[in-house]
């Protein structure tokens, strides 16, 4: 069995409203679900994605008010990739970032593709990748204020930085079924091992960097919490549960998240991996034109709606 690319990436923010202002209004992503952290429902969990909330397009944020800024280092998910249609789109975004005073590093190359690295208002590290192959899922967001020919298509390569690459590489290749396709220099970072899964292409890639000269990352606002990989359905997820357990990894067991089912475990360098089913998806409780408009709760939290909403600061 092999995973089928990136399902979603989840990160941390200290302010849900400022997060929404940046990711929806500046980047033009669609808020596809305004919900809460199911393990701590007093905090927002915001899901952004493409026009129809396809798996493989979702970038999510847990709000933790007053959380301290992160300190960059190893044992971390060190950047999040977002795919755009091509290099022409990168030039559009470079101009837009300059107009919006977004910190960026200019257009460069990574793993054979043109990229534009940038940071959000909390220092979250992101990379726009020119996806000339176009293998990944993703439909342009309508009414986003961004021309469709330049707009977000979905998640791109996810970068991991670890002090010792070999144990993580073993998990990715020998357990999860990734394939190493090349080793590429990354400016200021040494060499990245480029791995792909599923159908291949930018939407399925992990870039693994070994840095034993850095301290361990301290998580906070601007850091990434976990990366999730796609699996077909609950039956396949049950098979993964058996495999992960057999390999000796402590894990969560299968967790009901309503919009998908999930399995969590930490790889040897401590990075949190999740395996998530493609379905049932984010339209199980809202129509397309309703996505992200109101606070959505899974049925097992619905009886606490009044209590939960009273503790959340309204955002729009």
Swiss-Prot record:
Subcellular compartments: Cytoplasm
GO cellular component, one term: cytoplasm
Annotated VOC domain residues: 5-131, 154-278
Stimuli inducing this protein: Repressed by MhqR. Strongly induced by stress due to exposure to 2-methylhydroquinone (2-MHQ) and less strongly induced after diamide or catechol stress. Not induced by oxidative stress due to hydrogen peroxide or methylglyoxal.
Coiled-coil spans in chain: none
Chief subcellular location: cytoplasm
Key words of the record: Aromatic hydrocarbons catabolism, Cytoplasm, Detoxification, Dioxygenase, Iron, Metal-binding, Oxidoreductase, Repeat
PANTHER family linked to this entry: RING-CLEAVING DIOXYGENASE MHQA-RELATED, RING-CLEAVING DIOXYGENASE MHQE-RELATED
Family: Belongs to the extradiol ring-cleavage dioxygenase family.
Protein name: Putative ring-cleaving dioxygenase MhqA
Organism for this UniProt entry: Bacillus subtilis (strain 168)
